[in-house]
Regions:
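Short, aromatic-enriched amphipathic alpha-helices that serve as compact interaction elements
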Residues: 1-14
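Short solvent-exposed beta->alpha transition segments
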Residues: 14-58, 166
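Post-HExxH zinc-binding segment in Zn-dependent metallohydrolases
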Residues: 51, 220-239
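A short, structured loop/turn motif at beta-sheet edges
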Residues: 57-63, 92-94
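A short hydrophobic beta-strand element
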Residues: 60-73
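Extracytoplasmic
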Residues: 62-64, 84-86, 107-109, 116, ...
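Short beta-strand edge/turn micro-motifs at domain boundaries
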Residues: 78-111
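Juxtacatalytic substrate-recognition/specificity segment
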Residues: 111-222
Length: 239
């Protein structure tokens, strides 16, 4: 039943569909948002075939199940097999029906949690949470609210020590961005009001500015404009 659920989602190719029958929308508006690296919506119309192989299905904590899948393709020119990603998705029975759950949503139930002002922190087990960083982030949150003329935003903040740990909160056991040269990284997801930090810090003003710009003008800005505003108010990321 779980395998069929995942296979049907992959086969249909409807990525980030707000009416998807496969996902739970109980706590996330776009539960499959972080699966952009798989390219769900293009799997069936690429110039090459992508093989999806389920390599593990097992029960985890709090009534959830985990499904691990590899996505790979054959390079026609070199004859080499390329591993694209190894993904982790979760499932849970809700109202007598299994639905897919994002990795981030599942990890909310098992990660260390701290509420600091308007921010819900979810802490990767390899990261040591520092309350002073979180308080500084909340102060910046209040400052940005005044700057943009809105109420302080309430959002989730996943904090990990590096990009490798962070990618696993997105739902990847493997993806090439886990191994970027700096070992750090992060991103703001405005539709789910979530910041993912792989810079070993609970203070990430640059990404918070992105949440505010998206909140005030709810659409994707041009990259240069969005990054320019975030850098102006929140400083550069250095990675």
């Amino acid at each position: 039943q779980l395998i069929k659920l995942w296979k049907d989602y992959i086969s249909e190719g409807s990525f980030q569909d707000p009416t998807s029958p496969y996902w739970s929308f109980e706590n996330m508006k776009v539960p499959d948002e972080n699966f952009w690296a798989i390219g769900i919506n293009t799997l069936n119309n690429r110039g090459y075939k992508v093989q999806c192989k389920i390599i593990g299905v097992f029960e985890v904590e709090n009534g959830y199940w985990s499904l691990i899948s590899s996505f790979s393709h054959l390079d026609k020119d070199s004859g080499e097999i390329h591993l694209d990603v190894i993904s982790a998705v979760y499932a849970k029975k809700i109202n007598d029906k299994y639905l897919l759950i994002s990795s981030a949503e599942y990890l909310k139930t098992v990660f260390e949690h701290h509420k600091v002002g308007n921010i819900n922190y979810y802490v990767h087990p390899f990261h040591k949470f520092k309350i002073e960083e979180a308080e500084r982030m909340q102060e910046f949150n209040v400052k940005m609210a005044k700057e943009f003329g809105v109420e302080p935003l309430e959002f989730d903040y996943f904090v990990a020590r590096n990009a490798r740990d962070l990618a696993r909160t997105w739902g990847y056991e493997y993806m090439n961005r886990m191994y970027n040269p700096t070992g750090k990284g992060g991103i703001a997801r405005w539709r789910n009001m979530t910041i993912y930090s792989g810079n070993n810090s609970s203070d990430y003003p640059h990404e918070l500015v992105h949440l505010y710009t998206y909140h005030v003008v709810p659409k994707e800005p041009h990259l240069w404009i969005g990054e320019g505003i975030a850098t102006f108010f929140g400083g550069k990321t250095d990675y």
